[in-house]
């Protein structure tokens, strides 16, 4: 059995007594205080999720025509600083992965499911699209919940829904997969623990992937295999 990959927050999760599981080849927190309790954190207040197992690729804006050809949405005409949910398809029209694009003036951030990251990278390689893999040099933290935006507003600029923003060391979008409002923040690994500690001082609770799965299943949100 191959060794599981870990995010930069692995030791942090252990210090929080998280229940760790094998999730698409990554050792990830399933729960901290219990799945149902964490689900209610998000529904009633705010929680944060480590979703750094998800693939993060930076692509040059100059390749947008070629990228547009590979997905089932119109990316090239999307306004800059917007986020787009889409699906990469094969030549036969089958789904390879459901993904999120964050569009900026000079580049694109592509976020894909952990189980399909290598498939997406291979698909891009085959189609001669170059990218920078940020998966191991950054973390991705989702802050979600009824009060999430009020809390985040104390820390950073709040973009419109489905919009993106760059500020200081943060690259983020007002997106998520729980059915509640919030943001997903990409941040250098060296800064993540300080960022999370700041969230916790404002009452944001750690939540595992179990409660995240409950949230999107409860709302019948789609996902390609596992995230």
Report each predicted region and the residues it spans.
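Acidic, low-complexity central loop/insert segments
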Residues: 64, 100-216
């Amino acid at each position: 059995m191959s060794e599981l990959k870990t995010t930069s927050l692995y030791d942090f999760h252990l210090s929080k007594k998280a229940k760790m599981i094998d999730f698409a080849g990554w050792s990830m927190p399933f729960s901290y205080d219990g799945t149902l309790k964490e689900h209610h954190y998000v529904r009633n207040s705010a929680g944060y999720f480590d979703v750094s197992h998800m693939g993060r690729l930076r692509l040059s804006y100059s390749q947008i025509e070629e990228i547009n050809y590979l997905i089932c949405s119109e990316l090239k005409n999307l306004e800059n600083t917007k986020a787009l949910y889409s699906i990469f398809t094969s030549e036969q029209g089958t789904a390879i992965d459901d993904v999120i694009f964050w569009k900026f003036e000079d580049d694109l951030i592509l976020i894909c499911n952990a189980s399909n990251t290598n498939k997406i990278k291979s698909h891009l390689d085959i189609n001669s699209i170059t990218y920078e893999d940020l998966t191991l040099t950054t973390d991705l933290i989702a802050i979600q919940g009824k009060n999430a935006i009020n809390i985040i507003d104390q820390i950073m600029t709040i973009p419109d829904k489905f919009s993106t923003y760059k500020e200081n060391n943060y690259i983020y979008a007002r997106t998520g997969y729980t059915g509640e409002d919030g943001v997903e923040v990409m941040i250098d690994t060296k800064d993540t623990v300080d960022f999370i500690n700041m969230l916790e001082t404002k009452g944001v609770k750690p939540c595992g992937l179990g409660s995240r799965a409950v949230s999107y299943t409860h709302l019948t949100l789609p996902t390609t295999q596992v995230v």
